């Protein structure tokens, strides 16, 4: 069902894939639509123990409507750029993950996921707690349960 990376020399290890997912600040979520895929850049949090990607959303909008119709998604994260051998063209890591994305309906689980998500982006736990106290009512949290992932590093030239 999922195709392997064609150029084997570009494949990164499972540990490197996890590092990209842990450290990348943004990713692109692609959702099935009728004629074209719908892709949107998002902030996210990766939990390697649960093999899941979490992101927040409003409770209404195109993304929500499409996920309610079809929960199969593709997610792409771009890792760091590495300059090697005095080359002008960087090497770039990327990860592609496929899975099913669902709204987290349990409020305790939503708040736990929201806190872990926010800790990735905010400088202190105090700020996170304050923001959650003020803004968590209108926030929805989604979980992508990863079914397949792959990663590679390529030189962009």
Give, region by region, the residue ranges found by the protein language model.
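A generic structural signal for nonpolar/aromatic side chains embedded in well-ordered alpha-helices
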Residues: 21, 66-67, 117
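Short Pro/Gly-enriched beta-strand edge/turn motifs at strand-loop
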Residues: 11-12, 23-28, 124-127
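Active-site-adjacent structural patch at catalytic or cofactor/ligand-binding sites
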Residues: 57-59, 69-82, 91-102
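Beta-strand secondary-structure signal
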Residues: 28, 54, 74, 98, ...
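Short beta-strand segments
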Residues: 24-59, 75-76
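Extreme N-terminal tail/first-helix region
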Residues: 1-22
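Anion-coordinating catalytic cores for phosphoryl-, nucleotidyl-, and glycosidic chemistry
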Residues: 9, 18, 62-64, 75
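Charged, gly/pro-rich active-site loop segments
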Residues: 2-8, 83-157
């Amino acid at each position: 069902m999922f195709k392997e990376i064609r150029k084997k020399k570009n494949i990164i290890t499972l540990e490197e894939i996890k590092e990209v997912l842990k450290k990348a600040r943004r990713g692109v979520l692609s959702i099935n639509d009728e004629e074209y895929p719908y892709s949107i850049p998002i902030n996210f949090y990766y939990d390697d123990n649960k093999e899941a990607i979490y992101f927040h959303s409003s409770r209404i909008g195109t993304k929500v409507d499409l996920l309610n119709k079809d929960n199969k998604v593709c997610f792409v994260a771009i890792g760091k750029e590495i300059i090697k051998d005095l080359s002008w063209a960087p090497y770039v890591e990327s990860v592609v993950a496929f899975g099913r994305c669902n709204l987290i309906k349990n409020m305790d689980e939503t708040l736990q996921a929201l806190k872990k998500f926010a800790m990735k982006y905010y400088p202190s736990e105090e700020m996170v707690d304050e923001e959650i106290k003020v803004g968590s009512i209108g926030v929805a949290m989604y979980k992508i349960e990863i079914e397949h992932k792959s990663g590679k590093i390529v030189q962009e030239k």
